[in-house]
């Protein structure tokens, strides 16, 4: 299974982190105040849009200062007990706690829901109050009223969206290391759609590169759409598979800006990666199949049926796993994969282009539409091509791809052995063996 590039090329040190110089300086001063025994703040909150490097900065900081990183996802209430446990141990001296140098990282604190995760915020506040170790929290949007007490207890550090030039340097460096041909205009288009999200840029670059083998403007325009500021396909998958409640799974699908059919392909690719039980996989695919049926009906009958699509594609897949009902269940962390259909597009795009140009050439010669050429003219031309291939090729100036397509139609127009036998019976009926007397 190929490693996701955003993990493969994640900065290993603060020096490698692009476009966040002020933030890096603030973090260095803060951690050094801890190391000198006079911390300026017990905890910092790194906040900013997805993909700007919040978690990466925390990891790079720990690596640069040779500190162990203890990481938890604050938005997962299954970690509430862990947070409380860490809060207690963090108040004990380093020699009892284990390795002396540590940073505690709590990711996605804005994912805490006050009613569903009751007790999480008090537990984090207790951790900050008692800790003998530096604490880093991250959030996309820390301004929810329920997080006010946390904001008052930490040093707030904002990360800005990444600019065009740092992102372009990053993408070009990856293309060079992966030995991939990339066109500047194509990279510009990816960046324009990304809303400054480096992870989104890298994910899109990898999908196109693995599918097409090169990154051109046409390929990018075909596959890359403007990123929603809140959700991308990877986050949608994670939010569905990790959902604890029906509404969480449905909201994840409803809020996603990914095309419905494309999102189904994402689930199709990743269901067997997330679920290990064959029964769970079967139930998830059953829900996905029914969602596909309802989507087809919604297009034909009315979009009121779209709610059923969301129910099946969100909660239907999320709760297909019976393992979730077991006490202490925790979803597996999975490196989600791009849909194989992207690779299929790469393989078929050249053929589709050849069909288009062939129909256009014939249409120009016969002054008819491409649809009429496909339905009426092409079958006759294919039959003629079997006897006069060179004349047709010269007249239409066919490319190798167009010749291949015409050969496919030629084979399709040939009668099968059954059809030949039926035709023989029709025109040469079997003589009766009986004789007149």
Curated annotation (Swiss-Prot):
Binding site for ATP: 48-55
Keywords linked to the UniProt accession: ATP-binding, DNA replication, Nucleotide-binding
UniProt cross-references to Pfam families, sorted A to Z: AAA
GO biological process entries: DNA replication
Basic and acidic residues composition-biased segments: 416-425
InterPro entries: AAA+_ATPase (IPR003593), ATPase_AAA_core (IPR003959), P-loop_NTPase (IPR027417), Rep_factor-C_lsu (IPR023935), RFC_lid (IPR047854)
Protein's UniProt name: Replication factor C large subunit
Organism: Sulfolobus acidocaldarius (strain ATCC 33909 / DSM 639 / JCM 8929 / NBRC 15157 / NCIMB 11770)
Lineage of producing organism: Archaea, Thermoproteota, Thermoprotei, Sulfolobales, Sulfolobaceae
Name of the gene: rfcL
């Amino acid at each position: 299974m190929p490693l996701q590039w955003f993990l493969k090329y994640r900065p290993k040190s603060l020096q490698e982190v692009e476009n966040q110089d002020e933030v890096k300086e603030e973090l260095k001063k803060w951690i050094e105040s801890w190391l000198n025994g006079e911390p300026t703040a017990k905890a910092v909150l790194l906040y900013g849009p997805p993909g700007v490097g919040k978690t990466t900065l925390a990891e790079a900081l720990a690596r640069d200062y040779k500190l162990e990183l203890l990481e938890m996802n604050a938005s997962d209430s299954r970690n509430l007990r862990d947070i409380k446990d860490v809060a207690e141990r963090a108040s004990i001296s380093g020699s009892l706690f284990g390795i002396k140098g540590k940073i505690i990282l709590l990711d996605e604190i804005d994912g805490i829901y006050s009613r569903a995760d009751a007790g999480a915020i008090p537990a984090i506040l207790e951790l900050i109050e008692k800790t003998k170790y530096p604490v880093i929290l991250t959030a996309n949007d820390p301004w929810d009223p329920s997080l006010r007490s946390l904001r008052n207890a930490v040093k707030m550090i904002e990360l800005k969206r990444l600019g065009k030039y740092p992102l372009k340097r990053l993408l070009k460096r990856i293309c060079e290391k992966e030995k991939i041909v990339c066109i500047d205009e194509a990279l510009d288009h990816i960046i324009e759609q990304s809303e400054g999200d480096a992870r989104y840029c890298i994910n899109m670059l990898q999908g196109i590169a693995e599918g097409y083998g090169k990154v051109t403007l046409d390929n990018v325009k075909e596959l890359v759409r403007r990123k929603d500021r809140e959700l991308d396909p990877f986050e949608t998958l994670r939010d569905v598979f990790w959902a604890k409640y029906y509404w969480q799974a449905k909201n994840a699908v409803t809020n996603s800006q990914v095309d419905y059919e494309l999102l189904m392909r994402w689930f199709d690719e990743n269901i067997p990666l997330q679920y290990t039980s064959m029964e769970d996989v079967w139930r998830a695919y059953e829900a996905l199949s029914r969602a596909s049926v309802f989507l087809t009906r919604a297009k034909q009958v009315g979009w009121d049926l779209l709610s059923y699509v969301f129910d099946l594609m969100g909660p239907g897949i999320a709760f297909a796993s019976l393992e979730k009902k077991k006490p202490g269940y925790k979803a597996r962390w999975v490196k989600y994969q791009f849909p194989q259909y992207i690779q299929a597009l790469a393989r078929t795009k050249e053929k589709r282009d050849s069909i288009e140009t062939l129909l256009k050439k014939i249409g120009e010669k016969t002054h008819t539409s491409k649809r009429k050429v496909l339905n009426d003219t092409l079958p006759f031309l294919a039959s003629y091509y079997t006897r006069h291939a060179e004349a047709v090729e010269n007249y239409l100036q066919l490319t190798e791809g167009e010749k291949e397509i015409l050969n496919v139609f030629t084979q399709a127009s040939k009668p099968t052995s059954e059809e030949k036998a039926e035709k023989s019976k029709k025109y040469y009926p079997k003589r009766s063996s009986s004789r007149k007397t």
